[in-house]
A protein has these predicted regions:
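Class I S-adenosyl-L-methionine-dependent methyltransferase catalytic core
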Residues: 1-215
Length: 215
């Protein structure tokens, strides 16, 4: 046994690294394990949290590798012993071949915008007596950002909502039309987490743009 981050393998070609690394907070340890293995591996085959499907995580992985396989692992029945409540997938990443001139071909980072001309994300309102933020004023509707009902839209009673659990939307045009469009989107992407479903601002912008801005 030894610390994996201290391990350097023999100088041989075509090394395959197989494992189920610890996840860490927001998948941070799994990313570190991947990037250490990437220094000398040809192929990396890991069981990882489903957050590894998200652009924000893939942008942190060694750019010399490309994803070639992804299989979702069941949560019910749990495939782990002992059982654990974590949403995982099995991914295979392969080192990208060098170009004709011998220079490495790198995967490119994906930059997702966090704003859209059709609406404005409103910041939270002022904090209350307990130090928690209050709902902002002026929002046309809110979209649930966390939990099993991720993507739900609330139009009425906004002042009763917990601000941190929602995205607060101010339409720059027709609010009813925009809310209706958001209501047709497929939010299953929010399940690509280790535990609680979530969808961020960049996810919302990307989902909306890919659905409506390409038509």
């Amino acid at each position: 046994k030894q610390d994996f981050f201290d391990y350097i393998p023999p100088d041989v070609a075509n090394i395959l690294v197989i494992g189920n690394p610890p996840f860490g907070r927001v998948s941070s340890l799994a990313v570190q394990f991947f990037n250490h293995a990437a220094q000398w591996a040809r192929v990396i085959a890991f069981i990882v949290p489903r957050t590894f499907r998200r652009v924000s995580i893939q942008n942190k992985l060694d750019m010399h590798f490309k994803l070639v396989h992804d299989t979702e692992l069941p949560t019910n029945p749990c495939c782990f012993t002992p059982p654990m409540m974590a949403k995982c997938c099995f991914q295979i990443w392969e080192r990208i071949n060098v170009g004709e001139n011998g220079t490495p071909i790198l995967r490119q980072k994906v930059k997702l915008p966090i704003n859209h001309p059709r609406w404005t994300f409103l910041p939270y309102g002022p904090t209350d007596t307990t130090g928690q933020p209050t709902p902002p004023t002026g929002a046309d509707f809110a979209i649930r950002a966390y939990g099993g009902k991720c993507g739900d839209i609330c139009i009425n009673g906004l002042e009763k909502l917990r601000p941190k659990s929602w995205h607060w939307i101010k339409s720059n045009g027709s609010a009813p039309e925009l809310a209706e469009q958001f209501g047709t989107l497929d939010y299953s992407f929010s399940q690509n987490t280790a535990r609680q479903n979530s969808i961020g601002r960049a996810d919302l912008v990307s989902l909306y743009s890919n659905t409506f801005d390409t038509k």
